[in-house]
Design a protein with these regions (language model features):
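Conserved acidic, metal-coordinating active-site core of Asp-based
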Residues: 94, 98-207, 211-219, 228
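Active-site metal-binding loops of divalent metal-dependent hydrolases
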Residues: 13, 68, 209-210
Length: 286
């Protein structure tokens, strides 16, 4: 039997509503979970800098950022998967070769988020942290992640082929593609977290909605897709709950809290040890 020790949340489209806020109901339920001994974690493709407002609000025990390239516990780095200055320049040059000199690019570093934006991103999303404008001409920094806006799937495929040593995932809500080290995925970051913190992956409940979340949901003891998730995520998750605008996470955790005796069996089913029977109830937070 396995109990839940860590609740792990993607941000955009999952923990965040469409207006890029966390609902008071969700915050209240998460506080209750923490009081009962659950660890709280964030697993996001945002850079740490662009998630700062939510990090301050949630105070997560575990932070996975830049799509898995960074893992922090408190102020301690547990895992980093960085590109060298030379590798970063090669990636930028490849993006411009395939997509043109005017293509929009973002780069995450440990300390900042760089973007050759055409429109200030904070005018579109006020939750977005500070982005430093650069034309990338003389960019010389180590990096965690590159994102490129690519409107043509053929060109996206060409860039993926040129950067075959990278992990590439598209974000479903636009035309952006993320490139990280092959070893920098959310699921790899979870395994690194487990190794350091003494947690087993089957003791984690993870929530997500997009392509980058699929591996994470499949790895953890229970992978939960939001009602607004893309179909590929719903099809690979253990269960689907309400949407991010319907307090889906809060409703799930509230119901889970009603079944105090339910535990995860090793195969992901739920068993009620008090009654000695397998339950059809879909919620568990022992």
């Amino acid at each position: 039997m396995k109990t839940c020790r860590l609740l792990l949340f993607d941000l955009d489209g999952t923990l965040l509503r469409s207006d890029k806020t966390i609902s008071p109901r969700t915050l209240s339920v998460l506080r209750s979970c923490r009081e009962k001994g659950r660890l709280l974690g964030v697993s996001t493709s945002r850079s740490e800098q662009n998630a700062l407002s939510f990090i301050r609000e949630l105070q997560p025990d575990i932070l996975i950022a830049s799509g898995g390239a960074l893992v922090k516990r408190g102020g301690e780095y547990l895992y980093l998967a960085e590109f060298s200055e030379e590798e970063t320049k090669r990636m930028i040059d490849a993006a411009r070769q395939v997509c043109g000199d005017e293509c929009e690019i973002t780069i995450d570093t440990l300390d900042a988020h760089y973007w050759n934006y055409k429109t200030d991103p904070r005018k579109q999303d006020r939750s977005w942290g500070d982005s430093i404008y650069t034309d990338f001409e003389d960019f010389r920094e180590r990096s965690l992640k590159m994102c490129v806006e690519i409107f043509d799937e053929k060109r996206a495929g060409q860039l993926q082929a040129m950067l075959a040593d990278c992990d590439c995932v598209r974000f479903s809500d636009g035309y952006w593609y993320k490139f990280t080290k092959k070893t920098a995925t959310k699921e790899r970051a979870i395994l690194e977290t487990c190794a350091v913190c003494g947690i087993k992956s089957e003791e984690i409940i993870a929530f997500g909605d997009d392509y980058a979340d699929i591996g994470m949901l499949e790895l953890c003891g229970r992978g939960i897709a939001m009602g607004n998730a893309i179909e590929e995520v719903k099809n690979r998750a253990d269960m689907v709950i309400g949407s991010n605008d319907e307090d889906g996470i809060a409703v799930y955790l509230e119901k889970a809290g009603q079944f105090q005796y339910l535990l995860f069996d090793l195969d992901g089913t739920l068993t009620d040890p008090k009654l000695g029977i397998t339950s059809c109830v879909q919620y568990a937070l022992a």
